[in-house]
Amino acid sequence: MPDIKVPMFSFAIIADTHIMPAGVSDTAPYKVLNKANQRIRKVVEDLKVQDPKFVVHLGDMVRPFPALSNYDDVCRLALSIFEGIPFPVHYLPGNHDIGDKHIASAPAPQVSDIFLEKYKKHFGPTFGAFDHQGIHFITLNASVINSGLSEEADQWV
């Protein structure tokens, strides 16, 4: 076994926070979503104690789809909660954030260039890469695969 003298580090993965408009009850069949905002605030506090070097959010930051009128407001609320995380946060979109894959059985509206731009306005790029302690991390946007959108090809360049 090689003698590697690189110090170990930890990072955090969070997903499906489903932040909802303040004071609005959700109509989803899953009652657990009614506590989404309270739950992510607790996660933010727990992350401060865990002290990861960075956080990766795997998507579904917000509950409303980008086609809904309250999407921008809820994205701003989400960012106000996430700014309590004192470490770099790398965001990846989920179907609630940019729309669903182009398949008939998908529950959300299909991903589109308009939805991608709305997401980027709040959370930045939908794919990318970063380095930490000599490790190269690559983040991809799976929702655009087989979509025919230009971003599908762009992320592979």
Residue ranges and their predicted role:
Residues 2-3, 30, 66-156:
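Extended active-site neighborhood of metal-dependent phosphoesterases/phosphodiesterases
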Residues 1-68:
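N-terminal active-site segment of His-dependent metallophosphoesterases
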